[in-house]
């Protein structure tokens, strides 16, 4: 297994697919990186030379990935909560942030339904 950006990349997969295992690198960005480095997209990770791996590592350091990206996202959410923005309030309450309706669905964000004590017979 090759180690890039602190992540063990599976060696039996194609390079394009294996790069998407890194948080912050999607399909489009992995294609772009491989085109810039002139690396064949269909080659397996185990068949990469050490020179190609080092070029990949140096190219990926240019992008905001893994821990830095996760930290940036959490700080952005924390900032929204501190300034009292509407999105921050939704994050704080654990509700959908992007304008979805909550009357029916949104159970993945809200959690399991809580039982309400009914009227006694």
UniProtKB/Swiss-Prot annotation:
Query: In the UniProt record, does the keyword rRNA-binding occur?
Result: yes
- Say which family it is in: Belongs to the universal ribosomal protein uS13 family.
| Coiled coil (residue ranges) | none
Instruction: List the keywords (alphabetical).
Output: Ribonucleoprotein, Ribosomal protein, RNA-binding, rRNA-binding, tRNA-binding
| Keyword Membrane included in the entry's annotation | no
Q: What is the lineage of its organism?
A: Bacteria, Bacillati, Mycoplasmatota, Mollicutes, Acholeplasmatales
Q: Which gene encodes it?
A: rpsM
Against PANTHER family, the record matches this protein to: 30S RIBOSOMAL PROTEIN S13/40S RIBOSOMAL PROTEIN S18, SMALL RIBOSOMAL SUBUNIT PROTEIN US13M
- Annotated spans, Disordered: 94-121
Q: What NCBIfam families would the database entry show?
A: uS13_bact
UniProt-listed SUPFAM superfamilies: S13-like H2TH domain
InterPro entries reported for this sequence: Rbsml_uS13_C, Ribosomal_uS13, Ribosomal_uS13-like_H2TH, Ribosomal_uS13_bac-type, Ribosomal_uS13_CS
Query: What this chain does, per the record?
Result: Located at the top of the head of the 30S subunit, it contacts several helices of the 16S rRNA. In the 70S ribosome it contacts the 23S rRNA (bridge B1a) and protein L5 of the 50S subunit (bridge B1b), connecting the 2 subunits; these bridges are implicated in subunit movement. Contacts the tRNAs in the A and P-sites.
Protein's name according to its UniProt entry = Small ribosomal subunit protein uS13
């Amino acid at each position: 297994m090759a180690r890039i950006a602190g992540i063990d990349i599976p060696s039996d997969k194609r390079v394009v697919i294996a790069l998407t295992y890194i948080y912050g690198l999607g399909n489009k960005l992995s294609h772009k990186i491989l085109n810039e480095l002139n690396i064949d997209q269909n080659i397996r990770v185990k068949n990469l030379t050490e020179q190609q791996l080092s070029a990949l590592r140096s190219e990926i350091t240019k992008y905001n990935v893994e821990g830095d990206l996760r930290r940036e996202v959490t700080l952005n959410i924390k900032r929204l909560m501190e300034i009292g923005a509407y999105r921050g309030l939704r994050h704080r309450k654990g509700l959908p942030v992007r304008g979805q309706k909550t009357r029916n669905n949104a159970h993945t964000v809200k959690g399991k339904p809580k039982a309400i004590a009914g009227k006694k017979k």
